[in-house]
């Protein structure tokens, strides 16, 4: 039981060391994440569009679809 108490005391001590970001830092990081997400989404959309067109052309040339 003493080990469990020690564990929780150490967890609380470590939790007190956490430094939370300021509102400005949080919003800046959030904005960066949104921009990267949007760019990545557009990138994969374009790749999907290109590959689906290529595959459709191949299937059409082979008379499959």
UniProtKB/Swiss-Prot annotation:
<dbReference type="GO" id="GO:0005886">
    <property type="term" value="C:plasma membrane"/>
</dbReference>
<keyword id="KW-0812">Transmembrane</keyword>
<dbReference type="GO" id="GO:0006605">
    <property type="term" value="P:protein targeting"/>
</dbReference>
<keyword id="KW-0472">Membrane</keyword>
<keyword id="KW-0811">Translocation</keyword>
<comment type="similarity">
    <text>Belongs to the SecE/SEC61-gamma family.</text>
</comment>
<dbReference type="InterPro" id="IPR005807">
    <property type="entry name" value="SecE_bac"/>
</dbReference>
<keyword id="KW-1003">Cell membrane</keyword>
<dbReference type="InterPro" id="IPR038379">
    <property type="entry name" value="SecE_sf"/>
</dbReference>
<feature type="transmembrane region" description="Helical">
    <location>
        <begin position="35"/>
        <end position="51"/>
    </location>
</feature>
<feature type="topological domain" description="Extracellular">
    <location>
        <begin position="52"/>
        <end position="65"/>
    </location>
</feature>
<keyword id="KW-0813">Transport</keyword>
<protein>
    <recommendedName>
        <fullName>Protein translocase subunit SecE</fullName>
    </recommendedName>
</protein>
<dbReference type="GO" id="GO:0043952">
    <property type="term" value="P:protein transport by the Sec complex"/>
</dbReference>
<dbReference type="InterPro" id="IPR001901">
    <property type="entry name" value="Translocase_SecE/Sec61-g"/>
</dbReference>
<dbReference type="GO" id="GO:0065002">
    <property type="term" value="P:intracellular protein transmembrane transport"/>
</dbReference>
<keyword id="KW-0653">Protein transport</keyword>
<feature type="topological domain" description="Cytoplasmic">
    <location>
        <begin position="1"/>
        <end position="34"/>
    </location>
</feature>
<dbReference type="GO" id="GO:0008320">
    <property type="term" value="F:protein transmembrane transporter activity"/>
</dbReference>
<keyword id="KW-1133">Transmembrane helix</keyword>
<comment type="function">
    <text>Essential subunit of the protein translocation channel SecYEG. Clamps together the 2 halves of SecY. May contact the channel plug during translocation.</text>
</comment>
<dbReference type="GO" id="GO:0009306">
    <property type="term" value="P:protein secretion"/>
</dbReference>
<keyword id="KW-0997">Cell inner membrane</keyword>
<dbReference type="Pfam" id="PF00584">
    <property type="entry name" value="SecE"/>
</dbReference>
<comment type="subunit">
    <text>Component of the Sec protein translocase complex. Heterotrimer consisting of SecY, SecE and SecG subunits. The heterotrimers can form oligomers, although 1 heterotrimer is thought to be able to translocate proteins. Interacts with SecDF, and other proteins may be involved. The channel interacts with SecA via subunit SecY.</text>
</comment>
């Amino acid at each position: 039981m003493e080990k469990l108490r020690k564990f929780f005391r150490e967890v609380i001590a470590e939790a007190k060391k956490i430094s939370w970001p300021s509102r400005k830092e949080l919003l800046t990081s959030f904005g960066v994440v949104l921009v990267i997400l949007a760019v990545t989404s557009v990138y994969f959309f374009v790749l999907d569009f290109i590959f689906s067109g290529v595959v459709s052309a191949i299937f059409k040339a082979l008379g499959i679809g």
